[in-house]
UniProtKB/Swiss-Prot annotation:
One of its GO terms (cellular component) is nucleus. InterPro entries: C2_dom, C2_domain_sf, CAR1-11. PANTHER family: PROTEIN C2-DOMAIN ABA-RELATED 4 (PTHR45933), PROTEIN C2-DOMAIN ABA-RELATED 8 (PTHR45933:SF25). Binds to PYR/PYL/RCAR abscisic acid intracellular receptors in an ABA-independent manner, both at the plasma membrane and in the nucleus. This is Protein C2-DOMAIN ABA-RELATED 8. The modification N-acetylmethionine is found at M1. Stimulates the GTPase/ATPase activities of Obg-like ATPases. Mediates the transient calcium-dependent interaction of PYR/PYL/RCAR abscisic acid (ABA) receptors with the plasma membrane and thus regulates ABA sensitivity.
Length: 165
């Protein structure tokens, strides 16, 4: 990847109150897209509250670019049914990556991110220092659907030779 500034590890933890697309349930999976990169979680059968706990890693060239998360109901013989989507604004997370972590204690809050028109946060999100890493836990409110949220965690991974902050 040209002009790679780092890697973004996205841990897709779980879905909350996702819509039912197959009678009383769904077989959801998540597709994460940024530019030409497209990754997906495994599917979870018969659940509107799936536990994925899958880790997906994207190469980041432009931290101003949004990451799109789409949830689908897996169908075997027909096209997958959409179950909502959300955008992840990684810019606030990227902006704190230059923080000097040597003086931080475990659990230190670095920044709070409030829900806004620039993100799909269902509630305020905290960027914290934990076990030597800067992490952000988020609950994303799905759009274009009756109900549903997805809980994720993001982590920045520096790449040798990438530009410094």
């Amino acid at each position: 990847m040209e002009n790679l500034v780092g890697l973004l590890r996205i841990r897709v933890k779980r879905g909350i109150n996702l819509v039912s697309r197959d009678s009383n349930t769904s077989d959801p999976f998540v597709v994460v897209t940024m530019g030409s990169q497209k990754l997906k979680t495994r599917g979870v059968e018969n659940s509107c509250n799936p536990e994925w706990d899958d880790e997906l890693t994207l190469g980041i060239n432009d931290p101003n670019q949004h990451v799109t998360l789409e949830v689908y109901d897996k169908d075997t013989f027909t096209s997958h049914d959409p179950m909502g989507d959300a955008e992840i604004d990684i810019k606030p997370f990227f902006e704190v990556q230059g923080t000097d972590i040597q003086e931080l204690t475990n659990g230190t809050e670095i920044r709070r991110v409030k829900p806004s028109g620039d993100n799909c946060l269902a509630e305020e999100s905290r960027i914290i220092f934990s076990n030597g890493k800067i992490l952000q836990d988020m609950i994303l409110q799905l759009r274009n659907v009756e109900s549903g949220e997805v809980e994720i965690q993001i982590e920045w991974i520096n790449v040798t030779g990438s530009s410094d902050f």
